[in-house]
Amino acid sequence: MPRRKQQAPRRAAAYVSEELKAAALVDEGLDPEEHTADGEPSAKYMCPEKELARACPSYQNSPAAEFSCHEMDSESHISETSDRMADFESGSIKNEEETKEVTVPLEDTTVSDSLEQMKAVYNNFLSNSYWSNLNLNLHQPSSEKNNGSSSSSSSSSSSCGSGSFDWHQSAMAKTLQQVSQSRMLPEPSLFSTVQLYRQSSKLYGSIFTGASKFRCKDCSAAYDTLVELTVHMNETGHYRDDNHETDNNNPKRWSKPRKRSLLEMEGKEDAQKVLKCMYCGHSFESLQDLSVHMIKTKHYQKVPLKEPVTPVAAKIIPATRKKASLELELPSSPDSTGGTPKATISDTNDALQKNSNPYITPNNRYGHQNGASYAWHFEARKSQILKCMECGSSHDTLQELTAHMMVTGHFIKVTNSAMKKGKPIVETPVTPTITTLLDEKVQSVPLAATTFTSPSNTPASISPKLNVEVKKEVDKEKAVTDEKPKQKDKPGEEEEKCDISSKYHYLTENDLEESPKGGLDILKSLENTVTSAINKAQNGTPSWGGYPSIHAAYQLPNMMKLSLGSSGKSTPLKPMFGNSEIVSPTKNQTLVSPPSSQTSPMPKTNFHAMEELVKKVTEKVAKVEEKMKEPDGKLSPPKRATPSPCSSEVGEPIKMEASSDGGFRSQENSPSPPRDGCKDGSPLAEPVENGKELVKPLASSLSGSTAIITDHPPEQPFVNPLSALQSVMNIHLGKAAKPSLPALDPMSMLFKMSNSLAEKAAVATPPPLQSKKADHLDRYFYHVNNDQPIDLTKGKSDKGCSLGSVLLSPTSTAPATSSSTVTTAKTSAVVSFMSNSPLRENALSDISDMLKNLTESHTSKSSTPSSISEKSDIDGATLEEAEESTPAQKRKGRQSNWNPQHLLILQAQFAASLRQTSEGKYIMSDLSPQERMHISRFTGLSMTTISHWLANVKYQLRRTGGTKFLKNLDTGHPVFFCNDCASQIRTPSTYISHLESHLGFRLRDLSKLSTEQINSQIAQTKSPSEKMVTSSPEEDLGTSYQCKLCNRTFASKHAVKLHLSKTHGKSPEDHLLYVSELEKQ
């Protein structure tokens, strides 16, 4: 049969102008109330499609028939009355125009058609709104009765082929229903959710994940996105509009079985969060409802698929967001004269509010957390977000704002004024560590930003208390002759004490315009990511520890990967926590000369410089080995920097000619406290709490000294943005993911070799005597492992020495368990091979600031140290701070609510109930009621609890053949495990006697003994299990060990520790608190 011709969908009532509505009502002489009553019957008496196709083909193609069959059935959840008004209006216009054309084919077909078919045709025809006055009188009683039945089931999916269903009979029954008052039950509806599959998340679990194709139910065409499927359904007419209003007045009409409807109610709330129109925010019960809504309202054309193209004319700010946007600048606006006045913010919001879309409904409150709509939201309030915090100027793009901040230096003023006033900046709350650093003299060294790092970096990087102070001689041969405006130092005295000959270069807007095209996609992606983070933070629903839009973070174009690029220059992302100003100066870096040409396509390798680098590395190794033998441990400066992929400008040329006195501290190889002879005071970075893991994905594969080797920095097309995103994501997820190393990269091989040489040098030299006390030591320890947790304990060295005044980056990690880090204070001359790159240090100090915004409760477990240098002197002197660990790091056994003594009694009773068969296998027999009574009376456990414990044990034994204290029962060779001392016993009788030795009484005496007697016996009894366990030399001294928590005794220290961990859930660190040693008798 030919498919029904599809009429172009109307706009929803929300988009019909008020003048048209008024005109339509005047033409027809109807008020809205009459029309509302009218709309019902028109939807109910739909013309049956199949019968009509045979009976009156010419009528089928007329617009009036299409309107009645398809359009009048549009009582969607949006606005019932206004939708009906729109139906009425368009229907009346069409019917006036084409009444004559419609009636002619009707006369032709009356001869051949039966009386029933004619009734159906005329009823359908009269149900049009053109005949509304007649219709009102003719069908009002029927509509009242039939209201609930036909709309009882809300929408179902779109395929609806059923040969057994009689369309004609159903239509006639509905038409003549006014006659029979007794028929209250509805016809079985073809579109009810019982007969058809719902496209719900339970049946099609993967449909919302993007893993599956979106298929059209009618023609099975597959589409990648829901929008494409919606467009297809619109063009081909492969959908049926079942958006009836649900009838709340008549619950008897509910067509679903009760159990089914309850099951569907479970996931209804979750489904409505997903099945939401991204334009208007309405929720729908099924995917088909959503698709029909999108088709009828054309909303799918209004949702930006990936990125905003043009700003929306009417800026949509829902009323519920007004308060949130008012708070945008308050936390970080400085009180300086240039600060944005608060009044202008509210005025702007009022202006935006007046322009806002009049059709926003209360449901819209959650409409912007969904899909691509965060891009809309960003466009709507771009002027609020992209605003300079210092002078209040708005910008259209992040690039312009960044250029403005760089050129004017406003980011320094904003941060400094906020710090002077003592106001915390939102991204970097002032922690106690900052206050300890205020006394130290600091020189702020802000550095130039590249175009590409701008979206993600925030004022956190500018905090003057975190800036790096570096003492170096710049190699003049390699100095670039461009003009480099020198940064003014804030305190005058600092210029005298710090001999810095570095020059700084701020990017101009012209530089930004010359940026290579390849970086723009990344900029947009990062811009979207930051935008969504802002929106989620304002909405109050951050997830992933501040990275709300994980989907946006991974929607990045596949960039060309350079061998250096995989681990090199990538931007760390920082979400704005409740703050909307994206001020994005780059990481503060020292002594970076500007790139000579920003558009160089490929870095040229200077092999002569590479040879020099190799020579310098080998020389430094030799010097390290010599210096390590000196007792005072003077350190030789390194020439090498190993930046983290989180640092933003890795490839720019770094001039490094360090003097022999002031070196750089390495962040990679071995624990490295500084030497005392250093004079330069430098602020230490805020320590990150124990257990926070900062990921350094390819830390050792690329060195900052590649700048010596490359004439030009690698440009953005060779950046792998996913490595930066992954590293920051992993910080929040607590995972230490290691991306694959570039195997054939000569640079990475070179620096791996130098790392291993330095490590060998550290291990080969015996640790000298510890001549200085621990308080002279810097408490920041580092080692090579990429995935070790951080244990940066707080405190600063007495003389404020850090070699070369380098800011210590919180990425480098110190194992809490390694006390060797202190003893190897003088040994750690491998210092010279650690990273001296201020790039990495500042990038990672920013990330540490971001971590402070996360809750303390998410700290992850510390992993065990694996570097060789740590293992060398594990038993050396200990630091109090190094042994402090957070509760989350402590190893917790399984928490059991059982009293261990009760478990022993139950296990012994169960073992006693095992019966051995003639084949040698054991079978379980139940405990007698008397035995259970004795256990219950003694232990205080209820009979029900005892029965449940026994049933659980039997179930586990039948299902898996073993349980916690008994394995291999089904094989005939059972193994019994003692919970207390981890002994393994082969026979039930031995096991029972062993448990009785722990308990201090025999099970057969259980009924005779009183609780007091048993407790006294337990206290006096010494465990005979000492004979079974082979004692270690430390236990030959005539001691046994008693648990203070339950007064049981054990033969070995290992046994009591095992008992404390398994039974009481105590950490190994706390074992000494709960164990008392007893003299053997």
From Swiss-Prot:
InterPro entries: HD, Teashirt_fam, Znf_C2H2_type
Modified residues (Phosphoserine): S682
DNA-binding region: 891-961
GO biological process: long-term synaptic potentiation; negative regulation of DNA-templated transcription; positive regulation of synaptic transmission, glutamatergic; regulation of respiratory gaseous exchange by nervous system process; regulation of transcription by RNA polymerase II
GO cellular component: chromatin; growth cone; nucleoplasm; nucleus; plasma membrane
Region annotation Disordered: where it falls in the sequence: 141-161, 238-257, 325-364, 473-502, 579-604, 626-687, 855-897
Entry keywords, A to Z: Cell projection, Coiled coil, Developmental protein, DNA-binding, Homeobox, Metal-binding, Nucleus, Phosphoprotein, Repeat, Repressor, Transcription, Transcription regulation, Zinc, Zinc-finger
Tissue: Expressed in brain; strongly reduced in post-mortem elderly subjects with Alzheimer disease. Expressed in the fetal neocortex.
Main subcellular localisation: nucleus
Compositional bias of kind Polar residues: 335-364, 581-603
Subcellular location: Nucleus; Cell projection, Growth cone
Zinc finger (C2H2-type): 214-238, 275-299, 386-404, 976-998, 1041-1064
Family: Belongs to the teashirt C2H2-type zinc-finger protein family.
Subunit structure: Interacts (via homeobox domain) with APBB1 (via PID domain 1). Interacts (via N-terminus) with HDAC1 and HDAC2; the interaction is direct. Found in a trimeric complex with APBB1 and HDAC1; the interaction between HDAC1 and APBB1 is mediated by TSHZ3.
Disease in which the protein is involved: TSHZ3 haploinsufficiency due to proximal chromosome 19q13.11 deletions causes a neurodevelopmental disorder characterized by developmental delay, absent or delayed speech, intellectual disability, and autistic features. Some patients may have reanal tract abnormalities.
Designated name of the protein: Teashirt homolog 3
Gene name per UniProt: TSHZ3
